[in-house]
C-alpha cells in the first residue's frame, strides 16, 4: 500500500492517483463492478480490506504526523480517502454521460482528458491539504 511507503504524504498523492487511474483505465468497468459488489456484500469487502493490511488508523497517524510537522492542514482519513477516490473514479464510472455532454461523444478526446486529469486531481488534493482554510 502506497501510504505505508517511505516519504512525505504529498508525494504519495501523485503515486496513488497515477496507480488508480492506470488500473481503472485498463479496467473501465471496475468501478461499477466494485460498487455493485460492495452493495451486495459489504462485510466481504470489509474483510478483504482488513486482510490486505489496509489500516485506517495507520493512515490517520501518517496524516497526524504531517499535520504536526506543519506540512498539511488537519483532515480525517475518512474525508481524504473518499475525496481522493471519488475524484479518480467518478469520471470513469460516469464516462457515457461525461463523454457525451463535455466531449460530444469523442472517445479519443475523453481518453486525453482522463490522462490529463491525473495531474489535476493530484494538484487539487494537494492544494486542499496545504492551502490555508478560509
Predicted feature locations:
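Hydrophobic alpha-helical connector segments
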Residues: 1-32, 69, 77-84
Amino acid at each position: 500500500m502506497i501510504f505505508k511507503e517511505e516519504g512525505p504524504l504529498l508525494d504519495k498523492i501523485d503515486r496513488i492517483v497515477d496507480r488508480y487511474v492506470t488500473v481503472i483505465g485498463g479496467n473501465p468497468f471496475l468501478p461499477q463492478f466494485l460498487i455493485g459488489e460492495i452493495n451486495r456484500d459489504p462485510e466481504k469487502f470489509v474483510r478483504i480490506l482488513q486482510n490486505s493490511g489496509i489500516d485506517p488508523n495507520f493512515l490517520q497517524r501518517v496524516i497526524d504526523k504531517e499535520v504536526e510537522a506543519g506540512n498539511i492542514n488537519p483532515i480525517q482519513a475518512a474525508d481524504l480517502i473518499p475525496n481522493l477516490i471519488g475524484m479518480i473514479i467518478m469520471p470513469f464510472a460516469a464516462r457515457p454521460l461525461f463523454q457525451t455532454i463535455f466531449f460530444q461523444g469523442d472517445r479519443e478526446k475523453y481518453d486525453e482528458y482522463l490522462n490529463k486529469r491525473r495531474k489535476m486531481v493530484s494538484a487539487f488534493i494537494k492544494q486542499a491539504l496545504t492551502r490555508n482554510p478560509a
